[in-house]
């Protein structure tokens, strides 16, 4: 059946069951077999040779192929892309795998149980390599600083996330070894030490992830040479120092800046506001001080709809659509992939030592979907203009020293699904007749607020000024309308009989003369 079939795409159908070599007998002309995203089990004999020896792309991600490494791959000499991720393989990667095909360029071995040191790669044609979510251990020296016979000149994307790698990042990264590298993901390992200065030689770098390690020290100034950076994630480490002023001027292409849970300190420089492409900002859990810069309205990608073109960095060929960013919002962490996170906007300065008032300029960020300023020392009122931030889905202003009433404009946020104003000095009645009553009472505790969902106010007239103003305006309008109606009715009561009763009319006009 289908002896001339060249392309078979069964991807992401959640298919289950057993697949044997008999299913492939007639598929000798197959060039593209894409079936990742299913839960199928492949059961073949140890000496099986696939009939589709001319295959170019093979996608078996999430199939059960293990626990042994599938040796039948060795016969596919023309293959250029192979995905055997999440395949239950607990074996070692055989040495032949790195040069069994002269065409191999894209390899995904992620989410298996490979262990030991990182492999020695002899092929110089690999563009995308994903070894993430395995049990590789040891240091990075041999892998990142290859000898001349192991060139990495074609590599564009390297994923080593969530392994057991340790030691320092070697100071041997260079444009000659990695001239085309755009993605370097070494997050969630046990790496220590400082970021080497040579990182600045990776001029093509677009995504740089080191979150969840044990790295320390300052951000090296050399990183300002990586002017193509879209994403910089140094979260959950022990970095310290100020955010250098050059960050805003040199890395103006940044879309994601995530520095949460470190030891950064000092004030945010006005140069920070030059990050006009920024969509996701996370500086939470540090020691920043000072006021929130008023120039944040210059973060234009948060002000208006993003004009970022994903094709600018060639997502398809570099597989950058698989890159992701973690956003903490609505009290939880969410992971967004690159194709999505350019549409997400988040502003998180929580758990620092920012003080002063929330700048009115913040309310001009009309594209913002998540705002978290909790755990600071902010004072003053919540800006009345907050209702202009129509896209907001999550607001957390808890654990500050904010005072005054909840602005009525907050009820204009139709997409708001998470709100936390607890433990401030807010007072007055929670605006009624809006979704603000649908939030749990815990969102308002630790203040001097009243009204649903809290206890009722002692004085029903104790309503927010804005509601009072609206009520006063309403009453004033009816007062004047009533006067006009009364005036008209009164005159009709006097003049009506004059025109209706002839004797009265005669008497009135006689007196008038």
Feature annotation, model-predicted:
Residues 454-513:
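Terminal membrane/secretory targeting segments in land-plant proteins
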């Amino acid at each position: 059946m289908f002896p001339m079939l060249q392309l078979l795409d069964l991807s992401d159908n959640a298919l289950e069951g057993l697949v044997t070599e008999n299913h492939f007998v007639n598929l000798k002309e197959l060039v593209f077999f894409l079936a990742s995203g299913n839960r199928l089990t492949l059961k073949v004999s140890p000496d099986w040779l696939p009939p589709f020896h001319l295959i170019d792309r093979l996608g078996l991600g999430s199939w059960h192929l293990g626990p042994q490494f599938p040796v039948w791959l060795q016969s596919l000499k023309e293959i250029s892309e192979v995905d055997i991720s999440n395949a239950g393989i607990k074996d070692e990667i055989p040495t032949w795998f790195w040069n069994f095909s002269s065409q191999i360029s894209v390899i995904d071995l992620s989410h298996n149980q490979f262990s030991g040191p990182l492999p020695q790669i002899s092929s110089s044609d690999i563009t995308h390599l994903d070894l993430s979510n395995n049990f590789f251990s040891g240091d990075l020296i041999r892998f990142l600083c290859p000898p001349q016979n192991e060139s990495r000149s074609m590599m564009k994307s390297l994923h080593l996330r969530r392994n057991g790698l340790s030691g320092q990042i070697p100071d041997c990264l260079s444009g000659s070894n990695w001239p085309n590298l755009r993605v370097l993901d070494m997050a969630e390992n046990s790496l220590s030490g400082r970021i080497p200065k040579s990182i600045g030689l990776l001029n093509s770098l677009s995504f740089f992830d080191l979150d969840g390690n044990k790295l320390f020290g300052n951000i090296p100034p050399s990183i300002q040479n990586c002017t193509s950076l879209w994403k910089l994630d140094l979260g959950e480490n022990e970095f310290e120092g100020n955010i250098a002023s050059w960050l805003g001027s040199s890395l103006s292409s940044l879309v994601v800046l995530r520095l949460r849970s470190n030891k950064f300190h000092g004030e945010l420089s006005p140069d920070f506001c030059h990050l006009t492409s920024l969509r996701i900002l996370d500086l939470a859990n540090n020691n920043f001080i000072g006021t929130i810069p008023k120039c944040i309205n210059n973060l234009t990608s948060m002000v208006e709809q993003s004009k970022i073109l994903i094709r600018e960095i060639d997502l398809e060929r570099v597989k950058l659509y698989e890159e992701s960013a973690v956003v903490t919002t609505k009290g939880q962490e969410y992971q967004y992939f690159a194709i999505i996170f350019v549409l997400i906007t988040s502003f998180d300065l929580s758990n620092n030592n920012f003080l002063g008032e929330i700048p009115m300029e913040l309310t001009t960020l009309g594209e913002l979907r998540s705002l978290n300023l909790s755990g600071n020392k902010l004072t003053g009122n919540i800006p009345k203009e907050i209702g202009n931030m129509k896209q907001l889905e999550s607001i957390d202003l808890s654990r500050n020293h904010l005072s005054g009433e909840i602005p009525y404009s907050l009820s204009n946020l139709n997409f708001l699904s998470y709100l936390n104003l607890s433990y401030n000095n807010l007072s007055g009645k929670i605006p009624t007749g809006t979704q603000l009553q649908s939030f749990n009472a815990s969102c308002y505790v630790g203040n001097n607020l009243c009204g649903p969902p809290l206890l009722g106010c002692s004085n029903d007239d104790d309503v927010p000024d804005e509601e009072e103003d609206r009520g006063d305006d309403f009453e004033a309008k009816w007062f004047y309308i009533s006067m006009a109606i009364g005036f008209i009715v009164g005159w009709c009561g006097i003049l009506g009989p004059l025109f209706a009763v002839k004797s009265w009319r005669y008497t009135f006009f006689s007196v008038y003369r």
